[in-house]
Structures are given as structure tokens and as C-alpha cells.
Amino acid sequence: MNAITSASAIRTVHVPLGERAYDILIGPGLIARAGAEIASRLKGRKAAVVTDENVAPLYLKALVASLDEAGIASAEVVLPAGEKTKSFEHLITACDKLLEARVERNDYVIALGGGVIGDLSGFAAGIVRRGVRFVQVPTSLLSQVDSSVGGKTGINSRHGKNLIGVFHQPDLVLADTDVLNSLSEREFRAGYAEVAKYGLIDKPDFFAWLEANWKSVFTGGSARIEAIAASCQAKADVVVADERENGQRALLNLGHTFGHALEAATAYDSSRLVHGEGVSIGMVLAYEFSARMNLASPDDARRVERHLKEVGLPTRMSDIPGDLPPAETLMDAIAQDKKVKSGKLTFILTRGIGQSFVADDVPASEVISFLREKHA
């Protein structure tokens, strides 16, 4: 965590990407001071805040007041909440509203919301006028530790999740930890899956720390800020090494190949499965598949499942309410995964806790056999 610095209760993680470098600020009260932080970086005259119908009543007024106090004029774009908002229809709406507001390249698009709003707003900012600057103000744990960092933006299509998008780095990320107090237990747990992921990728000591301290992370306070800062630093390190996902950055997709297929299988119905829950099940499946391929110990798979189950996350396909399509349909979704190259299946597998790696050309026959076994 060498790039994390402390200023009062605020942690700063720096993402050194040359001319596109930016800071992630983590701590309480950041929405109230957002205007001052943004004003010091703003080259234009105004901002457009993109949010959703769930977040707007909670935080939009406070953010706009902070912008007003800093002398920043703002427009507001409020979209429906939920994964289905990551669509062409709502992308077009957002772009049209930004153009109506006469947002220019040196102005700011501010994404106020969870991963859906961050992904869609960043995509809109990346294509309007061929690129408008933007700021992430993530309001869920999942978006604070994952989707708001790294510049990946996009929407879903009928062929799969996050298949259409651009790389567009933010100028600033403001992760106000106070907003996490408004999350439901289910939403917080779903975000925690992404926190645990960083330990499972290449930080076994962090995973062990989470096993010992997860209750304090859920309660709040310094342990929560520490977990978020460590997660952001872990992601920043990977992004700096491989910004465009040509190699190492694919490790961040641990659990996502299986997880995205399960999300598609539930038609992105959040009453059945949300993204972090899919990642939780997907990580257990990745460890179990690694054990099946004699790459990792079954004990590691059991350890991962035990911890995720302890915090209240689903760990099995059978934990998903309702019927799932057959294994062959799940396999079709996996074949559309963005990591597929030249038709070859690519998975993030593991040799143990904190020993994940990119596995190219995974035999489809092994995957389909494994899915049939787990589907039963």
C-alpha cells in the first residue's frame, strides 16, 4: 500500500497513468466537499451529474449544493435504477441529455451512483464530443472498490455483459464511505465479494486479514476504510501495469467468467442475482474447477467457499432462486466472454489462495462437464 497516503480521515490512492493520472479519495464526507475537489481540477465551466432514481433522492441535492458552493453550474440526468439500464436505449438518452446541457470537452460528467451508473456515464462521457472529462462518485461498495477505478466503461447487449464500451479514465474518484451506511445488507455483501477477490488474486495476506476482520469491515470505521483503500490500491497496481487488458489486468476477472454467465442466465434480474453475488459463486467455481484440473488443492476451494458463505454470500448455483437454463446455455454465454481470443476459452484459474493466473485455451469439454456436474 505504498501509494496510500493519509490526510485526516481521508485516504488517497494515486493511479499514475502519465497525463491521465488521477487520485482516488476514500473516506467520510466527500460528497459535501466534492465541489471544492472538482473545482480545483475543472478546466471548463460546468458539470452534468448522471445518477439513478434510487440514488438521486439520497445524494443528488447534497452534491449539487457542493457544486453550487464551488461556483460550478450543473445539469442533472436521472435514469432508471438497475442492471437493465446498461443498454443502448439508456446510453442514447444519457448522451442526448449531455448534449442538451451543452456539456463541452473541458466540462465534467459526474457519475453519482453504483456500477451501472458509473459504467454507463463513463461510456457516454467517452463518446460524447469524442471524449468529455468525467468524475466518479461511487455510492456502492462494489463500485468504490472495483468499477469506478481503471477506466473500463460500457453497456450490456443481448449477447452478454459489458461487451460494448470504451476505455475512458476518470479525472477523479470520490469514494465517500458515509454513503455505504445506506446500503442494504445484501448490497454491501455483494460489494464485499469484489474486496475478497483482490486477496484471492495475488494477496493471500489480505485474504487472511479479511477472514479475521470481515465483521469490522461490515461494521464500518477504520477497518472498512482500510479494506477499501487496499482494494483500490490493488486494482490501481494492475491497471497501471496493463491498462488495456492485454495480459495481467484480466486477473481482475477472477470469478467473472462464470459469474457473468449466471447473470445472463437470470436475465439480469436483480431479485435473483446481483453482480457481486455472481462473482461470489463464480470465484468458488473457479477454485473448484482449478482443483478439478489438478491445479489447486480442494482445501483452497473449501476455504474460499467457507469465508464467502460466512459473510452471507451465495456460493453455489443452487443458491440462485428459480430455475437455471441447462449447462449448454451457460456455456454459450461463456463463449461470448470478452476474454475469448481466436475462439479459445480463457479463464482466470488458480494454484492456491493468492495465486491466480490467466489460463488460455481451456478445454470446452472440461468446462461443460464441470457445469453439468454443478448444475445437477
UniProtKB/Swiss-Prot annotation:
It catalyses: 7-phospho-2-dehydro-3-deoxy-D-arabino-heptonate = 3-dehydroquinate + phosphate. Keywords: Amino-acid biosynthesis, Aromatic amino acid biosynthesis, Cobalt, Cytoplasm, Lyase, Metal-binding, NAD, Nucleotide-binding, Zinc. It is an enzyme of class 4 (lyase). Pathway: Metabolic intermediate biosynthesis; chorismate biosynthesis; chorismate from D-erythrose 4-phosphate and phosphoenolpyruvate: step 2/7. GO terms for cellular component: cytoplasm. Binds 1 divalent metal cation per subunit. Can use either Co(2+) or Zn(2+). GO terms for molecular function: 3-dehydroquinate synthase activity; metal ion binding; nucleotide binding. Belongs to the sugar phosphate cyclases superfamily. Dehydroquinate synthase family. HAMAP family: DHQ_synthase. Catalyzes the conversion of 3-deoxy-D-arabino-heptulosonate 7-phosphate (DAHP) to dehydroquinate (DHQ). NCBIfam families: aroB (TIGR01357). This is 3-dehydroquinate synthase. It comes from Rhizobium johnstonii (strain DSM 114642 / LMG 32736 / 3841). The gene is aroB.
